[in-house]
Amino acid sequence: MTGQSLWDVSEANVEDGEIRINVGGFKRRLRSHTLLRFPETRLGRLLLCHSREAILELCDDYDDVQREFYFDRNPELFPYVLHFYHTGKLHVMAELCVFSFSQEIEYWGINEFFIDSCCSYSYHGRKVEPEQEKWDEQSDQESTTSSFDEILAFYNDASKFDGQPLGNFRRQLWLALDNPGYSVLSRVFSILSILVVMGSIITMCLNSLPDFQIPDSQGNPGEDPRFEIVEHFGIAWFTFELVARFAVAPDFLKFFKNALNLIDLMSIVPFYITLVVNLVVESTPTLANLGRVAQVLRLMRIFRILKLARHSTGLRSLGATLKYSYKEVGLLLLYLSVGISIFSVVAYTIEKEENEGLATIPACWWWATVSMTTVGYGDVVPGTTAGKLTASACILAGILVVVLPITLIFNKFSHFYRRQKQLESAMRSCDFGDGMKEVPSVNLRDYYAHKVKSLMASLTNMSRSSPSELSLNDSLR
């Protein structure tokens, strides 16, 4: 057969230019000119083979006597392939598995762009849906796995109190201080902490009003002594709170790796640094410039509001979302940067001779930023018709640019919020009143890993079950 194609060697033997195809028992005669319309497909390439070896590379078997080509493929899908050779279009029935169909047409060398317009949208949509469902399933699985690891770490920390002096008492204090909502005591402590934080923030804000300031001997505005009392009480409470948590912490090294504990520390450190600086300035007048350091540190009191994250599921979820959404945030900043760069140059070109506020490109950066973020302060506005049209395009582009990444970030926020709720529900269900369970000859981590895993599986169905129904004690029995 060397040097000749299959059609050349079979032309005299194949009646009416036909070849026989057998696909899993489904037999058909096909005209060669029909197949040669699509020479890049498997059957089209089959007609151009010059040797038996080349033929067997494209089919599973070849009968020399019957001139029949056998393919070990699904016979139920081959009629769709036949229809393609006759019409040049692929059609996909709704009951077919799109992935099986995709693999089949890939085998026959038929590209997906041959799918007719009536089926194309549905076909590609059905291919995307399972990928989205798979992503959601992986997201839920990651949520369950992460929650399981965290709840297991929680149990390991609780077990460290066993065998220590006043271990059970310290464990109850640790649970009350670190887990708002765990018990009546923890709820009361949480409410008091929130009130002190809010009182400290309100005091700082009121102290900036001239009506609440008292001039000192040099006529400079100073703090009202009543506000100083509130401030000192707040610092005393925050210090007590931090020291108490540290005293009952199961792991002192791990204590300061917790972001919430670092926030507690940073909320009181500026006060003590300011106190030391003021004492140094009073004793050494030549270091009066250090007083400015004290003024800057006093402004850091506003960060005390972050202490509310310990008592708010939403704030903790927001922090986790920002931590794990750096790619989406970077994408958002990239989109905004590109838009700002383009529209600022356009606005500068149009308005530089008519508007002093837009006479430089850096000035146009500010205008483009407030326009794309739809803030629109109105301090600088274009005056020409072309400038107003540019501003309109800038605002519309900003809306589109901001909306796209925000959707991804919101999905992650929902994911972390759901996971945080699962953790809180599990911790509220814990009861260590009689201490940890004794498990002779069994590794404590392995034991609780086995028991808590079943709990976390049930927590994934919280939407169908009330949190009060999820009792950890029941799962440990």
UniProtKB/Swiss-Prot annotation:
- So where does this one cross the membrane? 185-206, 226-248, 260-280, 291-311, 327-348, 389-417
Q: What does the record list as GO biological process?
A: action potential; potassium ion transmembrane transport; potassium ion transport; protein homooligomerization; regulation of potassium ion transmembrane transport
The answer to whether the entry has keyword Ion transport is: yes
Q: Where in the cell is it found?
A: Cell membrane
Task performed by this protein: Potassium channel regulatory subunit that modulate the delayed rectifier voltage-gated potassium channel activity of KCNB1 and KCNB2 by altering their kinetics, expression levels, and shifting the half-inactivation potential to more polarized values. While it does not form functional channels on its own, it can form functional heterotetrameric channels with KCNB1 and KCNB2. Each regulatory subunit has unique regulatory properties that can lead to extensive inhibition, significant changes in kinetics, and/or substantial shifts in the voltage dependencies of the inactivation process.
The entry's free-text remark on domains says:
The transmembrane segment S4 functions as a voltage-sensor and is characterized by a series of positively charged amino acids at every third position. Channel opening and closing is effected by a conformation change that affects the position and orientation of the voltage-sensor paddle formed by S3 and S4 within the membrane. A transmembrane electric field that is positive inside would push the positively charged S4 segment outwards, thereby opening the pore, while a field that is negative inside would pull the S4 segment inwards and close the pore.
Q: What is this protein called?
A: Delayed-rectifier potassium channel regulatory subunit KCNS2
The record's gene field reads KCNS2
